[in-house]
Structure formats: structure tokens, C-alpha cells
């Protein structure tokens, strides 16, 4: 009995010491070592899978998911590091900044998938003037959020180093997260509007009435497919393509879980660095770690490269509310079933570069600023 008691006390001793440490950056909470090491392994596996999927499907937007994986691994390395030293600012910033901004890149990839889906189902289902507008508007919003969070994180780091108040940095950081949450809320409304139009409105159009009843569920997608864009009917109707058939559901799960996680992060910062949420790790485990894991695993199984036949099918994003092939004097000479891997790879590469040029460059600048912050802080200590 005494041995068991001693072992228990021995395992709790580091946590008790940390709780008594007034310099703790976690309000006395010690990040769980086993959990965070497990998350490093899980995210390492997911990261590897997405790299392989990028090579297999040559789907360039896998890079957005790869960026998320790298940041998640770095973030959990920071939390593991903090387990042995809860007062270490480098470990805390690595954890806080990387895990906070990681979803930005996943959402950047998701925004682009909506543009692809509008191309597949038809431009008339787009609420915005162009399918690509979804990517541009929301990726730009994420860039603003990312920059504001970077400024807030930098101000907090400098304030802690100088021994001054972090209030200003906290407020700026919260503003950045609030922009991200507001942007995602708007995207969710547009996403559900799109789903309503392709699943409910087309059935109303098919039966020429607007009943609100479960009878609509009896109408199969095959029956209403003639109301979608004919050019990509092969993607929608092939019976064995279960990845595409459930892709919209997978997207919904991913967006809702990431939105839940971002709301939690915003609430965590509003409550404060020593508030109830940040000092109780179970909230982080369920509302952050689990939510991001569900979103990423879902997008790994229902990968866009498989859903859209990334190696063999070209789905260029085009402007306007009307499908290009229906416009007068439009020569539809593109072979959408072109089996040339190199041609499709070039198309996806150009689309990726056009949509992700600014997020990638901003991310590089952001990480450079963080590195400079760490470097200057270490020099100040010396």
C-alpha cells in the first residue's frame, strides 16, 4: 500500500511543483506527456499519409493539409516540451501559435473544394459571382486573421520577455481569432445554402412543387441528376465512387469540427491565460485535439484527390453563374477525361499557385517573425 502511495505521489510531484510555480504559463496545469506524445505520433502518421496521397493523386491542394500536419506536430512538440518546464516561453509559444493557426490551412483547402463542387454540380448553384470567389474571399480573410494573430502572438512574447502587461497582445490575438470564427460562420452559411440548393431545391424543381416533407428523400440523386451540369455526370453517377457520394457529408463534418475548435480557442483566450479552460486540459483534448483529428481523418479517408479523380480528370475553375459550355460561341474542346498525368498535374499546380500564393508567402513571413522573436529573446537573456 505504501509503495502504491509513494508511486502515486511521485507521479503527481511534478504537477504539484508546477502548480506551485508562479511562473507557470498554463496557470498551474501541466500538459499530459502521454497524450501529447500520442498526438505527435498520430499527426506524424496523418502527415505521412497526406504526403503519399499528394504523390499518388498529384492533387496540389494536399499541400494545404500537409501544412496543417506540420503545424500540429510542432504544436504538440511544444506541449510535450512544456511538460518538463511549464515556464519555458519558447515551448509555450511553439504550442500556442502552431496549434492556433493550423486550421487556417485546412480551411484554405476546404474553401477550394467548394469551388470544385460548384463546377461539378453547376454554376447556377453558386451564390457568389464566381466559384473561385469562395476561395479568394475566404482565403484572404484567413490571411488577415493569420497576420493579426501573428501580431498578437508577437506582442505577447515581447511583453512576457520585458516583464510588462500582455493585455494588448491578448486583445490583438483575440481579434485575429474572432475574424477567423466570423469568416467560418459566413462560410458555413454559404456551404449549407449550396447543400440546400443541390439536394432540396433541385427536388422541388424536379416535382414542380415545394413540399416540406420526408417524401423528398425518396427521390434519388440519379432521378435529379439531369438538373446538374451534364459535363461531369460521370463523377456523380458512377456507382462505385463512394468517396464522391459521401464527400459533401465529409466536408460538412470537417467544417463543423474545425468551427467548434475555433470557437473553443476564442473562448479560451477571452476567459484568459489563467482561466478555467486553459487550466483544464480535458477541454483542450475534446474541443481542440479531437475536433482537429476528426476533421483531418475525415479528409484523409474522403480525400479530394480521390473524390475528383485527381490524376485523370480536369475540373478547371471558371468564372460566372453560367456553365461555360452553355454559353453561345463557346467551343468545348477540353477533354475532361484526359489521362495525361502531366497535363492534369500542371493544371492542378497552376490552380494551387493562383489560390495559395499569398497564404504560403504570408506563412513563411509569419514563421520568420516567430523565429526572429525567439532569437531576440534568447539574446536578451544572454
UniProtKB/Swiss-Prot annotation:
Bilayer topology: Multi-pass membrane protein
Expression triggers: In response to loss of mitochondrial DNA in a transcription factor PDR3-dependent manner. Induced in response to altered glycerophospholipid asymmetry of the plasma membrane in a transcription factor PDR1-dependent manner.
Biological process annotations from GO: lipid transport
Residues in compartment: Cytoplasmic: 56-57, 112-135, 193-241, 303-382
Cellular component GO terms, alphabetical: fungal-type vacuole; plasma membrane
Transmembrane segments: 35-55, 58-78, 91-111, 136-156, 172-192, 242-262, 282-302
Function field: Catalyzes the ATP-dependent translocation of sphingoid long-chain bases (LCBs) from the cytoplasmic site toward the extracytoplasmic side of the membrane (flip-flop). Involved in the establishment of the functional lipid asymmetry of the plasma membrane. Regulates intracellular levels of LCBs, sphingolipid precursors that are growth inhibitory at increased levels.
UniProt similarity note: Belongs to the lipid-translocating exporter (LTE) (TC 9.A.26.1) family.
Protein name according to UniProt: Sphingoid long-chain base transporter RSB1
Species of provenance: Saccharomyces cerevisiae (strain Lalvin EC1118 / Prise de mousse)
The encoding gene: RSB1
Amino acid at each position: 500500500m505504501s509503495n502504491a502511495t509513494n508511486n502515486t505521489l511521485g507521479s503527481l510531484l511534478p504537477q504539484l511543483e508546477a502548480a506551485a510555480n508562479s511562473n507557470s504559463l498554463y496557470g498551474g496545469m501541466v500538459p499530459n506527456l502521454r497524450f501529447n506524445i500520442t498526438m505527435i505520433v498520430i499527426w506524424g502518421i496523418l502527415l505521412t499519409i497526406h504526403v503519399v496521397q499528394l504523390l499518388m493523386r498529384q492533387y496540389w491542394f494536399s499541400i494545404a493539409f500537409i501544412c496543417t500536419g506540420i503545424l500540429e506536430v510542432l504544436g504538440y512538440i511544444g506541449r510535450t516540451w512544456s511538460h518538463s518546464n511549464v515556464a519555458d516561453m519558447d515551448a509555450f509559444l511553439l504550442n500556442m501559435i502552431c496549434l492556433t493557426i493550423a486550421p487556417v490551412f485546412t480551411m484554405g483547402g476546404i474553401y477550394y473544394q467548394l469551388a470544385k463542387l460548384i463546377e461539378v454540380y453547376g454554376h447556377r448553384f453558386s451564390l457568389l459571382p464566381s466559384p473561385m470567389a469562395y476561395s479568394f474571399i475566404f482565403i484572404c480573410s484567413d490571411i488577415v486573421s493569420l497576420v493579426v494573430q501573428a501580431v498578437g502572438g508577437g506582442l505577447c512574447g515581447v511583453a512576457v520577455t520585458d516583464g510588462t502587461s500582455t493585455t494588448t497582445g491578448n486583445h490583438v490575438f483575440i481579434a485575429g481569432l474572432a475574424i477567423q470564427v466570423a469568416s467560418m460562420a459566413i462560410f458555413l452559411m454559404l456551404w449549407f445554402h449550396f447543400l440546400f440548393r443541390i439536394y432540396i431545391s433541385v427536388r422541388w424543381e424536379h416535382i414542380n412543387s415545394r413540399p416540406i416533407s420526408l417524401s423528398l428523400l425518396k427521390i434519388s440523386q440519379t432521378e435529379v441528376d439531369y438538373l446538374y451540369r451534364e459535363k461531369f455526370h460521370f463523377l456523380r453517377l458512377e456507382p462505385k465512387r463512394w468517396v464522391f457520394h459521401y464527400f459533401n457529408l465529409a466536408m460538412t463534418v470537417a467544417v463543423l469540427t474545425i468551427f467548434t475548435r475555433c470557437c473553443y480557442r476564442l473562448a479560451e483566450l477571452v476567459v484568459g491565460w489563467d482561466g478555467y479552460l486553459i487550466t483544464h486540459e480535458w477541454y483542450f483534448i475534446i474541443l481542440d485535439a479531437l475536433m482537429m483529428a476528426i476533421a483531418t481523418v475525415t479528409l484523409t479517408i474522403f480525400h479530394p484527390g480521390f473524390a475528383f479523380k485527381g490524376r485523370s480528370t480536369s475540373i478547371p475553375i471558371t468564372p460566372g453563374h453560367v456553365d461555360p459550355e452553355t454559353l453561345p460561341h463557346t467551343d468545348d474542346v477540353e477533354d475532361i477525361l484526359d489521362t495525361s498525368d502531366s497535363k492534369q498535374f500542371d493544371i492542378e499546380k497552376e490552380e494551387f499557385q493562383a489560390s495559395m500564393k499569398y497564404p504560403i508567402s504570408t506563412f513563411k513571413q509569419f514563421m520568420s517573425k516567430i523565429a526572429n522573436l525567439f532569437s531576440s529573446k534568447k539574446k536578451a537573456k544572454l
